[in-house]
């Protein structure tokens, strides 16, 4: 009996209640987590000449940790998933052209402590009829928030943007 009590006391001593250290500003679409903040600045509908569709989301990231972070890793820590209806969207890698691989650029981008960088990520979509929802979470804690992006009002990027010959 004494051992059970000690175990219970030990467990309760080991798991102090943590206050969530995050905030979400719905108007600014800004999620501030414990080591980083992610803001959705804009989104653009894009389509390749072959008819592949994607949504290009422009993020503003800031690193409040003490370590330099890879931009993409930081983004993936805070952006839990991006969905259309209930379908999870995949990051569109090389959907358009090798010259325009935003995700590779995002992967190479390093964000030093206290630094702010903007990166752009493309998400492959089946159509532009269903809105996008971006779920934020602070590193697997219970904290979460959802940003809704209506694709109806988005600008569409000109197709020539993806033509390798067009400069």
Please identify what each model-predicted range represents:
Residues 9-13:
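C-terminal motif of bacterial Sec signal peptides marking the signal peptidase cleavage site
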Residues 44, 61-65, 80-84, 125-127, ...:
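Beta-strand elements of well-folded, non-transmembrane domains
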Residues 1-8:
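Sec-dependent N-terminal signal peptides
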Residues 52-57:
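Short, solvent-exposed loop/turn segments enriched in Ser/Thr/Gly
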